[in-house]
Amino acid sequence: MSHPSWLPPKSTGEPLGHVPARMETTHSFGNPSISVSTQQPPKKFAPVVAPKPKYNPYKQPGGEGDFLPPPPPPLDDSSALPSISGNFPPPPPLDEEAFKVQGNPGGKTLEERRSSLDAEIDSLTSILADLECSSPYKPRPPQSSTGSTASPPVSTPVTGHKRMVIPNQPPLTATKKSTLKPQPAPQAGPIPVAPIGTLKPQPQPVPASYTTASTSSRPTFNVQVKSAQPSPHYMAAPSSGQIYGSGPQGYNTQPVPVSGQCPPPSTRGGMDYAYIPPPGLQPEPGYGYAPNQGRYYEGYYAAGPGYGGRNDSDPTYGQQGHPNTWKREPGYTPPGAGNQNPPGMYPVTGPKKTYITDPVSAPCAPPLQPKGGHSGQLGPSSVAPSFRPEDELEHLTKKMLYDMENPPADEYFGRCARCGENVVGEGTGCTAMDQVFHVDCFTCIICNNKLRGQPFYAVEKKAYCEPCYINTLEQCNVCSKPIMERILRATGKAYHPHCFTCVMCHRSLDGIPFTVDAGGLIHCIEDFHKKFAPRCSVCKEPIMPAPGQEETVRIVALDRDFHVHCYRCEDCGGLLSEGDNQGCYPLDGHILCKTCNSARIRVLTAKASTDL
């Protein structure tokens, strides 16, 4: 029969690739086995493994003593049992009944089975319908488990759904079914091609792909944990109307951090702004507190309340007192100072303060007072420390207005640009370079000679006397004198413009192209070619570039140089070129054309013949 070919292969020796081949072969034999399709109910019911537990006690009567659950006597055999059991209750003793059934496995009960085979097939058909509608294995959970532990032969009856009897010659289809599906009873129902399709992907290496996916997703999980674990003092920039503070379970009241995932500082009332873990949780190892991670400082602007301490055990710094009262924090607040806020309430809105980050008044330069001793309050800008440019500009403006409104008693000319002191009194100062100096302070930067009433040179707001200034100047490479005016630099050297000339024509090369020979002498281009250019072997003139050209064109023949217009035949004077009939045909060191060369050869040949 072709029924076993429909079942999925369970033996490990058979490769999975043969399953489709079997399916194709089964389809080819499907037409002649249509009559066998009526026998499909036994095929579906066979994996129920009902006969297996019944066969185990009969196979090994003196073995390990497999326990057979005491089922009630079958209803069909109730007529035959009273003669044996008498008035015993439905569950008879297991050992006696097992031996009795074992004593006649092929006797009367087997004959009744064979005689009522048709009736059993009908009952199996009805049972198959019931199995398709509901779970077919509920009536025999203990029998299936008992049958899975033993290893009975492959002979299992198709009709043993209720009776505890095993035939010796069961149908071939039932035998193969029980062999193919001994343990996975829940998957034995769908016998058609569909189970084969479902069993195909099972042997595939699915775990390898999942392992790769889990490996790749692990770094993502770590990143998520880190991003979800801000430091206890991290706070995003609060939006308008949003206030952050410390609640009853915040870090203001508990010195120990709650967990690796730190919640926002507080919740208000019953509103769920953020989840706060219970105080009993301990910090997870590996997710310690990073003091500088994600901390946001606004040291000079008014915003929400303060941040937490410098470590997990320090309390938070909160604003205390009236919200509109600004109070300088004297340094480090004691641990008990952070518990001023009542539990469950937000701290009062006020200027944000952070430890160590508030600017101190030391870096701010104290206001300079006039030398006359006048002093006064300059306003709040001199009291409140600030480093912003606009605040500094405002401070200087107020300072200037104060100096203008409160001049000193004596004649005040300003502050000295050299020493920074006030210049007070007539005859004590002078003005130079749009600045005010004391007479004793306005000196040469090199020799310290007083420059009042003397000519001086100002270089980058520095005063030089004339001798010192001249000594700082560069000297001309030609005349070796200091260059007081415009400097002309060439070949890495400094020149006076009138000293930078050609060594041959002696004209100034200021703004004119020039070149330098091997000895470092400066030449104009024309004189350089006249001096160093190759000379024509005909006219003996230097071969120079044409006017307006930068390249020199010359002809070299017989190791001699020629101008283009000088490259001619010595006899006829014809212009020679690279043409076929206009090439150079030298003879005895003479440059000749082809015609003249042939004529000279004939003459020489005739003369030689005459001499002979």
From Swiss-Prot:
Cellular localisation: Nucleus; Cytoplasm; Cell junction; Cell membrane
Bias (Pro residues): 183-193
Tissues of expression: Expressed in a wide variety of tissues but no or very low expression in brain and peripheral leukocytes.
Annotated site residue numbers, Breakpoint for translocation to form HMGA2-LPP: 371-372
Annotated site (Breakpoint for translocation to form HMGA2-LPP and KMT2A/MLL1-LPP): 470-471
Post-translational modification Phosphothreonine, affected residues: 333
Residue ranges of every copy of the LIM zinc-binding domain listed in the record: 414-473, 474-534, 535-603
Keyword Heme: no
Keyword Amino-acid biosynthesis: no
Modified residues (Phosphoserine): 116, 151, 375
Protein name: Lipoma-preferred partner
Organism: Homo sapiens
Upper classification of the organism: Eukaryota, Metazoa, Chordata, Craniata, Vertebrata
Name of the encoding gene: LPP
